[in-house]
Regions:
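Short glycine-rich, Thr/Ser-proximal phosphate-binding strand/loop in the N-terminal lobe
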Residues: 13-50
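A glycine-rich helix N-cap at a beta->alpha junction
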Residues: 101-107
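Conserved phosphate-binding catalytic cores of ATP/NTP-utilizing and phosphoryl-transfer enzymes
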Residues: 1, 107-127
């Protein structure tokens, strides 16, 4: 089975494709990035301009095509601090879903920290 994980941040979108083996171990099979510097486009009203929403959707669509081309079975997408910061994050989430069928989960601070901790433990073989 292959899965893709997309991290949607304020400066870049990253996608890593993993192959999950029967023993539930996994191996990276590709990494793709799109630098967008979205954080600098937040208006004084804490909204991402419509033009940047469209560009973000285009970027995620590109990553989705890469995932499909790699034979990915499932895509997981996560919005982090940037999504918590902007007032129109649900508009961005909805537009990404409409265009790609990908559901973006906006992580709260605790969930984001836990995922980072677990990833670090896995990377360094800690239990």
């Amino acid at each position: 089975m292959k899965v893709a994980v997309i991290d949607l941040g304020s400066n870049s979108f990253h996608m890593v494709i993993y192959r999950i083996d029967k023993d539930m171990s996994f191996r990276s099979r590709g990494h793709y990035s799109d630098v967008n510097a979205l954080g600098r486009y937040i208006s004084e009203t804490a909204e991402l301009p419509l033009e940047k929403i469209r560009e973000s959707v285009k970027s995620v669509s590109h990553l989705a095509r890469k995932a499909r081309g790699a034979g990915v079975d499932r895509v997981y997408a996560y919005g982090t601090g940037f999504f918590r910061k902007i007032d129109n994050s649900m508009t961005l989430v909805d537009e990404i879903f409409k265009s790609t069928g990908i559901v973006v989960e906006v992580l709260d601070e605790k969930a984001e920290a836990e995922i980072i901790f677990r990833a670090a433990c896995h990377a360094y073989g800690l239990k």
